Regions:
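Acidic, His- and aromatic-enriched active-site or binding-groove loops in soluble protein domains
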Residues: 162-168, 235-250
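An anionic, glycine-rich sequence signature occurring as long contiguous blocks
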Residues: 1-8, 242-334
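Acidic/histidine-rich, metal-coordinating catalytic segments
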Residues: 145, 215-224
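Catalytic cores of alpha/beta
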Residues: 227-231
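Short, surface-exposed connector motifs at secondary-structure boundaries
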Residues: 209-216, 235-237
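Hydrophobic "anchor" residues on beta-strands that sit immediately upstream
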Residues: 141, 217, 239
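Dynamic "connector" segments at or just before major functional cores
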Residues: 1-166, 170-190, 196-212, 258
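Short, electropositive alpha-helical surface patch
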Residues: 201, 232-235
Length: 334
């Protein structure tokens, strides 16, 4: 039986317009996973309920939905608080006599959130990730990356970062596929991998508790390499594949494969990139045991042969994972 048809009224009088109709889909998605409701349960609201005009959950939804539509600044809400689509998504109304929270109200909300509550919010992302699976996965590949968040003015905690050549924060992100697992705001005077081991340890422990048989793979570039991370992964049975900075020993070991890729490219007159892979057993001075190093020598048409190295616990299979999804975390940050 077909559902009854609903009348649709169209007029061209102008009236209250919006260019952000997609926010209505966010509102429906939020009702499904109860994200803003669960965030609201984490953040303590010290206000007297007798003297407030806006529920904290509505303020949270207002801020999140706006950021998702590229309205990052609180000042944007001077106008957005009257936007009919945002009103409908947040409060299920388009009544202009019931505007959303002001910029100052949202600013006070953001500034009263504690570090403990932020940690609990990140744990919520892990729970949402677990809930997204109907059946236990056999393997989880966790990507980690950091990016620059340029500061404006004299923001507290702003430092100059030589790599990004600017004053910025250096937030840390953990992803699995298209899902965010953790987002940690950090000052940029720390190393790229600062705090990564502790966060990964929490995520891995929680996933193992839910799915005891799942295989967990940690994947990151050379900035996240540390002997502590290798020790943790190997002790707890997790796989890893990490970028590895070159040194004189590794350059000597990989000289033949670099030369071979160059010669093959030249002799065959190829105009396509040519790659060779080789696996070595290498033991750094601080390592108690040797580990596998995978070397990729790549010759591009307009460049000489380039060489990249990664260390891993299980070379061939895990490197295929890396080759297939090498840019996953980077793409999530664009």
């Amino acid at each position: 039986m077909e559902p009854p048809l609903k009348p649709i009224a169209v007029d061209f009088d102008g009236g209250k317009l919006t260019s952000d109709g997609g926010v209505l889909l966010l509102g429906l998605a939020d009702k499904n996973i109860r994200l803003t409701e669960r965030i609201n349960a984490i953040i303590f609201d010290p206000r007297n309920p007798l003297y407030i005009a806006h529920q904290q959950r509505d303020l949270i939804a207002q801020r999140i939905f706006a950021i998702a539509h590229a309205y990052e600044d609180v000042n944007d809400h001077i106008r957005l608080r009257h936007d009919p689509a945002l009103l409908a998504a947040v409060k299920n109304t388009t009544d202009e006599n019931q505007p959303l929270g002001s910029a100052s109200t949202l600013s006070r909300l953001e500034n009263r959130i504690t570090e403990k509550e932020i940690s609990e919010l990140n744990k919520l992302f892990v729970e949402l990730f677990i809930e997204s699976y109907d059946t236990p996965p056999t393997q989880i590949v966790i990507d980690v990356d950091a990016t620059d968040d340029i500061i404006h003015g004299n923001q507290e905690g702003g430092y100059f970062n030589g790599f990004y050549d600017n004053y910025c924060f250096l937030p840390l992100y953990f992803f699995c596929g298209g899902q965010l697992l953790w987002s940690q705001l950090r000052t940029s005077n720390k190393g790229g991998g600062f705090g990564a081991v502790a966060i990964f340890a929490y995520i891995a422990k929680r996933l193992k508790k839910e799915w005891p048989d799942v295989e967990i793979v940690f994947r990151g570039d050379a900035g996240f390499y540390s002997s502590t991370l290798l020790w943790y992964c190997e002790r707890h049975g997790h796989k890893y594949i990490l970028g590895f900075s070159s040194n004189a020993v590794l350059k000597r070991m990989s000289a033949n494969i670099v030369f071979a890729s160059e010669m093959f490219f030249v002799e065959n007159g190829s105009q396509e990139p040519f790659r060779l892979f080789r696996e070595y057993l290498y033991q750094a001075g601080t390592w108690k045991v040797p580990r596998k190093i995978i070397v990729k020598a790549e010759r591009l048409p307009d460049k000489t042969a380039d060489c990249r190295r990664q260390t891993t616990a299980e070379a061939r299979r895990l490197y295929r994972i890396s080759c297939c999804r090498l840019q996953t975390a980077v793409c999530r940050l664009l």
